Amino acid sequence: MTNRHLAKFAYREEFKGDTEALAAAVREDASTGSTSQLPLEVQFGKMSNQKTVSVCIIGRPNSGKSTLLNRIIGEKLSIVTPKVQTTRSIITGIITLKDTQVILYDTPGIFEPKGSLEKAMVRCAWSSLHSADLVLLIIDSLKSFDDITHNIVDKLRSLNIVPIFLLNKIDIESKYLNDIKAFLTENHPDSLLFPISALSGKNIDGLLEYITSKAKISPWLYAEDDITDLPMRFIAAEITREQLFLNLQKELPYKLTVQTEKWEDLKDKSVKINQVIVVSRESYKTIILGKNGSKIKEIGAKSRMQMERFFGFPVHLFLFVKVRELWENNQEFYQYMKI
């Protein structure tokens, strides 16, 4: 386990059960200039030159939002697959560069939703704007500037938000790139435009330099080595869901969700994890299990390896499949998915 991971989880345990109160205290003291609300551990470590900036990353599905978050924080935190709508909730990533803490929000892709789950995902994406100092609108330069992207820009303008445009995937030749640049320059001259490649990292340093230049004097909300505030149970469920997306065909990945039902720390410093894959039909369960359980064993093995790589300790993973009809309309699952 890397030092960053150790610090991340140690911090969560130190303030377990009261992280919201801690964050509220930090914000209160940031506005008053006082440290009276903070725990002594934080008061003594408080530095007068600490700065913070929060950044929301929005855009269409598969435009590269999650890849950008992972690139900036230097860890694969947000799951990435070739399928659209992989990200279902807000994923918080954190990176501290010298005296500046950057808090990033990866969001579900914005599209024209149909079902209840899709509508909840899009609402979740828009809700993230309220927490951000900067809004990055990431645009896939390999595709035309379509009506959905126009609508996103128009809604941002209606909210008096001037987005920063990121033209992603510039490492691949595109017939649309110059036209998109010309359109944005002519119609949105007050917005900055950064051509980038989230995958290769091209121009990311310049983007980060701009982001940190907009940070304001404020105590950090997280420990210096934290990379996220997400619970480990949630991250483990996301890792398994990623493998389901990668190993199942067609529409099936959109018809399931994953919950971590049990997390048990064992004496040998390994962890036993029980997860439930929830599907809406018996036929979906049959596909996930595979012949003689071969498919779920494959998915379980790949998920376990990813968890061990991320968490840094041995994992004993047990997967179960349950059928819950119309789970997509159940608010209980939305709460678990944080949407």
Swiss-Prot record:
GO terms for biological process: ribosomal small subunit assembly. It is found in: Cytoplasm; Cell inner membrane. It holds the Pfam family MMR_HSR1. SUPFAM superfamilies: P-loop containing nucleoside triphosphate hydrolases, Prokaryotic type KH domain (KH-domain type II). Residues 85-89 are annotated as: G2. GO terms for cellular component: cytosol; plasma membrane. NCBIfam families: era, PRK00089.1, RPE1, small_GTP. Residues 168-171 are annotated as: G4. An essential GTPase that binds both GDP and GTP, with rapid nucleotide exchange. Plays a role in 16S rRNA processing and 30S ribosomal subunit biogenesis and possibly also in cell cycle regulation and energy metabolism. Residues 51-220 form the Era-type G domain. This is GTPase Era. One of its GO terms (molecular function) is GTP binding. Its main location: cytoplasm. GTP binds at residues 59-66, 106-110, 168-171.
